[in-house]
Amino acid sequence: MDLAGGVRFTLQLNKRAEAKEPISSKDQEEALNVLKKRLTGSVSNVDVVPEGKDRLVVDIPHETGDANQNIDEDKIKQIRAQLQKSAILELYLTHEQNNPVTIGKIERGEDVVPFSKIAEYAQPEEESGEEPRKLLLKEEILIKGEDVTAANAFNENGRWKINITFEGDGKKNLAEVSMKYAGDNVTKMAILLDGEIISAAVFSGHIPGGNCQISGDFTQQEANTLAVSMRNPLGVKPEILYEESFPPTLANEAINQGIRAGIWGLGLTAFFMAIFYRFAGLIALIGLSMNIILLFGILAIFQADFTLAGIAGVILTIGIAIDANVLIFERLREEMAAGKTVGIAIQTAYEKAFSAIFDAQITTLITALVLLWLAEGAIQGFAVTLTIGIIVSLFSALLVTRVCFNWLSATRKLNKPLKFTPVLSNKKINFLGLTKFSRFISVALIVVTILTIGIKKEESLGIEFVGGDQLRFNASESASIEDIKKTITETLNETKTPQIQKLTPIGGDSTIYSVRVEPGSGEKVKQAITIAGLAEGQIQSQQIGSVIAGEMAKRSLYALIAGLGVIFIYVTFRFEFSFAIGAIAALIHDLFIVIGITVLCGKELNLILVGAFLTIAGYSINDTIVVFDRIRENLRSQRGDVKDIMNTAINATLSRTILTSLTTLITVVSLLLFGGPALNDFSFAIIIGVIVGTYSSIFVASPIVYWWAKKKKVNLRREILDADQDDISPTATTN
């Protein structure tokens, strides 16, 4: 929606007739979660957020990215039906006196049938205005919708039906009445949805398993909509108040700026790779191009919506792909320096780089899969892009570039040693000897973060997190988003960034603006907009809750905790417990400090920055694992003090760490310089994250591993060699 626009439905939640209490915040949250579940199957990247105390706003993205396109009326009709149905399913037995004559007498007041009720059949739109068919039912509900455990649409002989499964009392009651009336060729049961009859049943036999079928003149769309709604019933009655289309959240200019920034970033990255790796850098660009083509191709095949969070995933994917190539080329540089032939050097470089690439990308993939499983909304969109990106990155780095090198080597087109521009080669810096200095820097940054967040508190949070006041008004002819934003800024001085959205009623030509401002400022902004002549007629105002709240916040938190837990287990399994402590500590260190610096620089924490922080987390763990892989390799093959071996490993990966950071920074700085205001906060946070992540992979992660192993008296070399021994088959021999 931030890149394509969409359609917005504003729902009023009304209590059901039998409800005694007014709509509560719990009712609102339950309705939000139910509608999300209903729409997930038919609409991707749907946003459902609370508005006021008894409303919900549902945003559906356009599929083509054209906010002015003609809306697919069939799809809108399907969504409208899903939004308005409470989907309360009730099954009644028909009354013994069920016949048109008796029903007519009851309606005219000429007769009374105790313990009965009249129900009408649901009417198709084409039959509206005609007298509906009716049945006389027993007053007591036979089976309630709460007993439904499954509902699925299926096609049988060209007719669409719905199969329902009941448990508990529903299953028991269905078994009893079906046995009693089995074989009676008379309508004995009516199935009601939201008080209207959708089907009437004749029992052809005993139903002991709790399954029944609803048949009627359903289209495929109607059957699917009913099945989804029955699986997710609502305890309230939703009513559509407004139905409007809206343009992209990011203006077309911002989108174009983002595209230009991406082109600049890729161009500068290509230039950078060619300078440092020369001919090998050109091969890497072939792999990177294949990576990007495959990524966007797969996203298009699965019709995944591309969002700002998706851009974050693409940036991290490009960083990971470049890192894989840098790892291979740094190994290739070492093998060529050792005097090996081109063919042998290429083979050895890929073999030695494989474990670092595999472990680094698998840990990032674990994070993406956990987010995909547990998270929602924009975070899930990030996870989809990143998951696909990691898989294609492995393919392009390990297969595409290797095929190119092998072909060139086999055809003798590449028979001279490859040349590279040396970067920080043969350095012997005592990084672990600088632990006191790095500890001081980290502690100082953490203290600054704590003080900044402690002082600013809710001031550091955007409207998505804390809620605020919402204004809604018809725009005057002279009104524009820029005018409204300027008026709000001048009125409130230092304020949270207002959220302004332009809306157009479906089928109408008027312009409506929806404005979200910080809590308690609605009345002041309302007066300012009126005085400025930006509104026609009355301005509606109400309080709104946070967009990131309730179930979404909990699921995202669970996803984060689960992701950290799985990474911890994987690193422990692949390396050793001390390494897992170092990896998680460095990751938390990076995120905490980046959040602190971002807030200190006056940025608001919002959904855009959530995507940036996820990118930073992926980059941080990837960077750390690469260093750990070299430490593990050196501990296997070198003798001497563990501290010296760890220093040697960090120095050996220093050029790779710096080069990967620089190539990633090139892309992100391009976004900062050319991406426009919309991408400013996003790119700023990632720049800080890359710098902090580079620092922590050198000065934080490895020193923590060494400190923990020393404190717990763990022999890192012995632990790693023992793990290797466990992996050796019984028939293998060692020297």
Language-model regions: role of each:
Residues 1-735:
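A structural signal for conserved, well-ordered secondary-structure elements
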